[in-house]
Amino acid sequence: MFKNTVISIKSSGNLIVLKTEAGSAGPAAELIDKLSYDEVLGVIAGDNTIFVAVDGLDHVDTIRRRLEDLLEANRLFN
C-alpha cells in the first residue's frame, strides 16, 4: 500500500512531510501510526499530505530514513 500512495518524503524542522496520491494520505498515516515509533509524537493526514511530528530534531533523520526504507522495501517486494 505504501509504495502505491507515497510520492515524496521530506523534512523541515521536527516535521516530516509525506506527499501522497489524492485520497490516500489517511491509510498511509494509519500505517505510520501502527509502526509505533517512540520518536513520533503524532501523525496528521489530509487528503494528499501527511505531517509526522518527531520528538526533537535529533530524531528526524532516523525516522525519515525508516520511512524511506519502508517505501523502498515495498517497491522491491511488490
Residue spans for each PLM region:
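Non-DNA-binding regulatory cores of transcription-related proteins
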Residues: 1-64, 70
